[in-house]
Design a protein with these regions (language model features):
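Cys/His-clustered metal-coordination modules, chiefly Zn-binding fingers
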Residues: 162-263
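Interaction interfaces in information-processing and related assembly proteins
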Residues: 1-197
Length: 263
């Protein structure tokens, strides 16, 4: 199965795309890939969210053959991308959700400095009943906040869990010395926390020459000729992994005169 997150904006960062591929077999690592499209001359290096303008935050879940893909979209907010993600869950899924994220340079005595990121996603399960205040949503820029979905004991439980989460420190999330299971126990042991086995994740890309050819199969040879370089080739670059593909234009398109193996 596949989970895709995408941000499109009118700011200096035009697009952020991330794909997570679940393990194909038990015991195998999951795969993740990502890229960003941006205008370097317009980048604000001091305040990250100044690079994100008006736009949307989208989630796509594809559970595989025979299952209908699901897509949800919500507007961006100016505070943070994590607030936009929380807003998506509140607006589209009616699930109170909060994210705490940190990133930074981490260094140990044995290794050179490296960039690390870490985070906690807190979500109230199962869905609470509708409990939107009569005076409207209270989240950033008119979006629902997690508290807008809760009342009574559910709101009290949510507030208590957030109180625990507020004690997390940056080094606990990005430092290599504290295992995630130990951190979760420290934060939520009073709530009877249960920690599942960790899922290994590595970089992985699904691009291939066959996929490039498939994407070009909707074009005629006339269209393909407009994509041909001065050297007489059709080229394509994968934005995720940087792989380059160099193809004979007579072997691509729905009316290609030659077979690919003729190259």
């Amino acid at each position: 199965w596949k989970l895709s997150l995408q941000v499109q904006s009118k700011g200096a960062v035009r697009m952020i795309a991330t794909d997570y591929f679940g393990p194909s077999k038990e015991g195998e690592p999951a795969q993740i890939r990502a890229y960003a499209s941006y205008d370097e001359e317009r980048l604000d290096h001091d305040v990250a969210m100044n690079n994100i303008g008006d736009g949307y935050f989208a989630v796509l879940i594809d559970q595989g053959d025979g299952m209908k893909p699901y897509q949800g979209i919500t507007g961006l907010v100016s505070t943070s991308l994590s607030d936009a993600a929380s807003g998506y869950f509140a607006q589209s899924e009616q699930l109170p959700t909060r994210f705490v994220l940190y990133h930074g340079l981490s260094q140990t005595d044995e290794a050179a400095p490296s960039w690390r990121g870490g985070g906690v996603m807190l979500q109230q399960m199962p869905p609470a009943g509708e409990h939107v205040p009569s005076d409207g949503p209270t989240g950033p820029e008119g979006h629902l906040a997690p508290e807008d979905l809760l009342g009574g004991d559910a709101l009290e439980n949510w507030s208590r869990a957030n109180f625990h989460l507020d004690t997390v420190e940056e080094l606990e999330l990005i430092g290599p010395s504290l295992p995630p299971q130990d951190l979760l126990y420290r934060l939520f042991h009073e709530e009877g926390v249960r920690v599942f086995d960790a899922q290994a994740v590595r970089f992985g890309c699904t691009c291939s020459e066959d996929r490039v050819r498939q994407s070009l199969s909707i074009y005629s040879q006339k269209d393909i000729s407009k994509m041909t370089t001065d050297e007489g080739r059709v080229t394509a670059d994968c934005q995720f992994c940087g792989a380059s593909y160099d193809l004979d234009p007579t072997t691509v398109g729905f009316d290609a005169p030659n077979e690919p193996n003729a190259e």
